[in-house]
Amino acid sequence: MKTPAPGRIHSIVLVLLSLAVLQTSKAQKVQNDIDIYSLTVDSKVSSRFAHTVITSRVVNKADAVREATFQMELPKKAFITNFSMVIDGVTYPGNIKEKAAAQEQYSAAVARGESAGLVRATGRKTEQFQVSVSVAPAAKVTFELVYEELLARHLGAYELLLKVRPQQLVKHLQMDIHIFEPQGISFLETESTFMTNKLAEALTTSQNKTKAHVRFKPTLSQQQKYPEKQDTVIDGSFIVRYDVDRPLSGGSIQIENGYFVHYFAPDSLSTIPKNVIFVIDKSGSMMGRKIKQTREALIKILDDLSPHDQFDLISFSSEATTWKPLLVPASTENVNEAKSYATGIQAQGGTNINDAMLMAVQLLEKANQEELLPEGSITLIILLTDGDPTVGETNPLNIQKNVRKAINGQHSLFCLGFGFDVSYAFLEKMALENGGLARRIYEDSDSALQLQDFYQEVANPLMTSVAFEYPSNAVESVTQDTFRVFFKGSELVVAGKLREQSPDVLLAQIRGQLHRENITYMMMSHVAEQEEMFRSPKYIFHSFIERLWAYLTIQQLLEQMVSALDAEKQALEARALSLSLSYSFVTPLTSMVITKPEGQEQSQVAEKPVEDESRGSRVYLGPMRFGHSVGDRTSRKPGGGLKLLNGTPLFGPPGPPAAASPFHRMTSRLVLPELMSPLAPASAPSPTSGPGGASHDTDFRIKGTTPTALPFAPVQAPSVILPLPGQSVDRLCVDLRRPQELVNLLSDPDQGVEVTGHFETAKARFSWIEVTFENPQVQIHASPEHVVMTRNRRNSAYKWKETLYSVMPGLKVTMDKEGLLLLSRPDRVTIGLLFWDGPGKGLRLLLQNTDRFSSHVSGTLGQFYQDVLWGPLDTADDSKRTLKVQGRDYSATRELKLDYQESPPGKEISCWSVEL
């Protein structure tokens, strides 16, 4: 292929599953030149082990050479196993080599003046892969990337994450996710940040006892963001969550092709009491949002302590101080006192990690010596810091040595690194050396939730000193088979290789300690039966257990290398490298070299990134190219996307500005003549469909109302607008006025729903509204900052006006670009939440299908769905009347209000209003 002159090359970043798109001033034309005519994602999950294939087919429609860049995101724990490009019928594969050999080939290319174009960077949950190639006029290119990962169980669920961002309409776009779980699938749910009601028509899910198939295949019209435009609405994450049945307490053993995997997660055990010390950094670098979020999270965590637990707090800056001289029981009184203490923590001073950690160990040792630790309980230390040590002992190696010597294998240490100014490698090694783990807390609006989620992972220990044993005449080798603690909602995984002449039955023994007793499980698995089970399903990729064994072994070897000494570390590295090369995994020890057509840049190298010692992100850029396009002039921040340096950042193709919603959100059945205001002349009903003509599952629109824009009216939106179907008045405006903070808005035990709110009387607004469902057990907490959905102790945060589409058994949760959050269930009342920006701004509650409330509904708002008696109009003033609810009289006044179901600034409506 002839290489065009540099001056004639235009760059297009072709995004499949990507972070961002850089555009030149002719970006729209260039994007149209490079056409993605097919994009498929095929993910096969076989007993937690996911094998994902991304295939993209593109054609250059221009009459000149164009450069296309394949760019995608994959999960952090995944290993790339293959990449190839097919150009003009010729396949150009990626070859996995030892990193040193790949670097030598890369350096030689650099010496020839060629560039290495692969960019790899860590994000919060994903890593980025990128490779570019020049495409001749009318030529077609097929990109294919394969990666594998073991889905870990967190808080009772496995999660498969896919990023979908094509940045243009794709004629053939299809995702297929096949799941096979021999234990049986207990629940399955999907969630998307880009799904609309129109796109949801292209999503299908089928499921039986052991198999599930999720397919997403949208048409071109379903993908369109705007009519007659090429912009796509598909831009974000697609997530599948599920869990499996566990009929046997000893777990599940699965065998295929001479390898086995043992999954262990008993769920019927009682929680072991814990003694936990929270060590909180309050140095000057924590000032501002960090310390505020830390206080917020700590208060929530303290509320979650079990009455059987004991705890204490240590805060440190230049010096460390304890809240109490000894651990105290987590009684209501002590927890409330600790919350008051946490509220007063202020940031200032240096960072003395060494003294704080030694003080924590001394507290536990003192409690142990005085026999204050309950029998059978476990001890945890949780450290939160955002920076490197600056006061006292500042040498990280000495601190690690001091902490290791003090703990002496008696306690588990968990280290949380807040932001990117902390040495993550320092914290990780210190945690791994002491039976715990490290976690980075990303500095963002949901940092407090990240802290709470981490605590939930370790909040409920079920077993300690867990050991797996297999007969030596049956098993040749196994992965890690001893574990210090098993926590509720997680899973222990052991994989191994069987001997060639192994018995027909594989036996396993699992020993562990409960709160007050030891326990032993016995398992037996027939090899031939297991082999047959994995031989038949057509969509299961075979030899997956062998690859799972290799994957898990490599991950554990890399983890052991963190705390190993030189000689041991070299041996671990040699074994991990050998397995990486044998099974074609791109790991931190290997690189993939991408070959390309003659005449093009010959060396592109993919590396597996690791958390950097100081900034949490390793970016492998190679030399920067110049003269090709502005797309090369980029900067990067840790975990972030790409940003233009020479002008306005452009992400994605331009489109028309977001238009105001063409429809009202609430539905009322009737507007009575007595409610009509002279300021509100009759007008045509609102349209009955959303953008693009798509009808919505739940239609919050006002039909037949007569709103008029308010040029001067000093009216505001009420606290709540209640639709009253079947009553003589079709809606009621409610204003909360009485001094009250926590308000029980409505509760219906038959519907299994409760809505509460925190009302700030001084500001006349809700600071939060919370909706709790009994089945499924889901809680939605809405604040002006964001929406938090909690299920199985797992928190997910969403910003207002970010598209959300989550479907779980018995509940659908959606949010559109205007910020309307809908919670809908079959044959139940639909609840909406909205943060309204108009006059009287704040959180608002919306209700539909209120005729479905039962006769047992109650609460400040729920009472109006009992027997309500409306009195006649006041003879002296027809804008007043009385209504009687459950024997209590309320005065109602006909007033002008702003309808918050409209986009701000809202429309004026006439409404009967009551003050509570």
From Swiss-Prot:
Keywords: Acute phase, Disulfide bond, Glycoprotein, Protease inhibitor, Secreted, Serine protease inhibitor, Signal
Cleaved signal peptide residues: 1-27
Induction / repression: Levels of ITIH4 in serum increase 3- to 12-fold on inoculation with various bacteria which induce mastitis. Peak levels are reached around 42-72 hours after infection.
Localization: Secreted
Domain VIT: 28-149
Composition bias, Low complexity: 678-689
PTM annotation: Appears to be both N- and O-glycosylated.
Similarity field: Belongs to the ITIH family.
Protein name as it appears in the record: Inter-alpha-trypsin inhibitor heavy chain H4
Source organism per UniProt: Bos taurus
